[in-house]
């Protein structure tokens, strides 16, 4: 199947942004790598900034759909099982889009108008869905043993770490985060943590 000009630009941009960073990559380099004219980038994305906005939005659109699918199963699974399924789906999504994931997670650490917009839409939705799952669990007497913001912070750290520190993981820990076995093994470790921060009973340990 022939790759479209737009898709070639996207693939080259993701590769170069990962290798050289957004600021260190020029429009000409992207065009050369994609074997297209510089004018094509202006036509499809209005320049490098528009290209980055497209990539970030594309990533979070897919990420958001993963969260929404989990939210649709609230009434059919226990809180822990639902969180575990959500975590596995997120890890799978990140692995299947690992170069894009790495680029986006680096960019969201930088304060900008685009990132503030992402925070107010996609990431607020993410918080809402996590909170909804936990609140539904409380109705079934499944309680977190730590405050919800702390739980979300720790979970997000676990999910993002492999894509923020891939060199550390491969060069220091001698693991291969790009291999499918890694995220499946990593999921098993997150599962242990999730099991450890819940209790069942009549009263929660935290507010």
Swiss-Prot record:
<dbReference type="InterPro" id="IPR023772">
    <property type="entry name" value="DNA-bd_HTH_TetR-type_CS"/>
</dbReference>
<dbReference type="InterPro" id="IPR009057">
    <property type="entry name" value="Homeodomain-like_sf"/>
</dbReference>
<dbReference type="GO" id="GO:0000976">
    <property type="term" value="F:transcription cis-regulatory region binding"/>
</dbReference>
<dbReference type="GO" id="GO:0003700">
    <property type="term" value="F:DNA-binding transcription factor activity"/>
</dbReference>
<dbReference type="GO" id="GO:0006355">
    <property type="term" value="P:regulation of DNA-templated transcription"/>
</dbReference>
<dbReference type="InterPro" id="IPR001647">
    <property type="entry name" value="HTH_TetR"/>
</dbReference>
<keyword id="KW-0346">Stress response</keyword>
<dbReference type="InterPro" id="IPR050624">
    <property type="entry name" value="HTH-type_Tx_Regulator"/>
</dbReference>
<protein>
    <recommendedName>
        <fullName>Probable HTH-type transcriptional regulator YttP</fullName>
    </recommendedName>
</protein>
<keyword id="KW-0678">Repressor</keyword>
<feature type="domain" description="HTH tetR-type">
    <location>
        <begin position="3"/>
        <end position="63"/>
    </location>
</feature>
<feature type="DNA-binding region" description="H-T-H motif">
    <location>
        <begin position="26"/>
        <end position="45"/>
    </location>
</feature>
<keyword id="KW-0238">DNA-binding</keyword>
<keyword id="KW-0805">Transcription regulation</keyword>
<keyword id="KW-0804">Transcription</keyword>
<dbReference type="Pfam" id="PF00440">
    <property type="entry name" value="TetR_N"/>
</dbReference>
